[in-house]
């Protein structure tokens, strides 16, 4: 268990004030920054996992207590760490993302909480491009077979021509707020894909993403995809 001195979870405060919280991922560990609404002065807690590359930290909005952290560790490689007390204590998850084939997870880049009606569900995106799901609050992870073992995956992911794992990754995972089975993912060296059946099947949705070299709907290279909060 990795223990840290950290501020307790935010408490209810008067409506006229608010607390700003930033979860910051760096090559030297993770940090949590706090400030008021003026943001002139900041408190900082961390680093968490000093000496590890932290790719992503995210607070679960469904309980406002749980934080998941994707890190590249020197001893165990790509791992996910979990805190259920807002960063005061961290533990590695029991079963991190792992491919069922000879392909190996090089990095874990993205962590996304599931739909609000599924408080136990999380998603993770990796390099090389892989999509994983947890149904036990992030403790154990399994492949989303409809994507990872899709017969068209090589066609989707190898149009850019790079072999660098630094670039080949799933960096964006979105769940429709009104439909937990509606998923959108964004990939570097791949593009944007949509599933309407919980990840069992996927359709490219790259029309409108401009490129000079590719004429079909595959092989785009977005670096981030986000949902509009009012019109997902």
Model-assigned labels for residue ranges:
Residues 1-232:
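Extracellular glycan-interacting surfaces
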């Amino acid at each position: 268990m990795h223990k840290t001195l950290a501020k307790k979870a935010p408490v209810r405060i008067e409506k006229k004030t608010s607390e700003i919280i930033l979860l910051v991922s760096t090559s030297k560990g993770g940090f949590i920054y706090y400030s008021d609404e003026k943001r002139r002065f900041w408190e900082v807690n961390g680093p968490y996992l000093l000496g590890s590359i932290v790719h992503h930290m995210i607070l679960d909005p469904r309980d406002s207590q749980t934080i998941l952290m994707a890190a590249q560790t020197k001893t165990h490689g790509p791992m996910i760490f979990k805190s259920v007390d807002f960063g005061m204590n961290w533990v590695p998850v029991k079963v991190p993302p792992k491919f069922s084939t000879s392909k190996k997870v090089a990095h874990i880049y993205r962590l996304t909480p599931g739909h609000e009606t599924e408080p136990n569900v999380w998603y993770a995106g990796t390099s090389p491009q892989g999509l994983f799901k947890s149904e036990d609050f992030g403790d154990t992870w399994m492949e989303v077979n409809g994507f990872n073992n899709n017969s068209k995956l090589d066609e989707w992911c190898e149009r850019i021509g790079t072999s660098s794992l630094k670039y080949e990754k799933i960096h964006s995972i979105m769940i429709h707020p009104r439909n937990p089975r509606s998923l959108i993912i964004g990939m570097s060296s791949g593009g944007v894909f949509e599933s309407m059946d919980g990840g069992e099947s996927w359709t490219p949705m790259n029309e409108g993403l401009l490129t000079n070299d590719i004429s079909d709907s595959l092989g785009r290279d977005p670096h981030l995809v986000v949902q509009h909060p009012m019109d997902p």
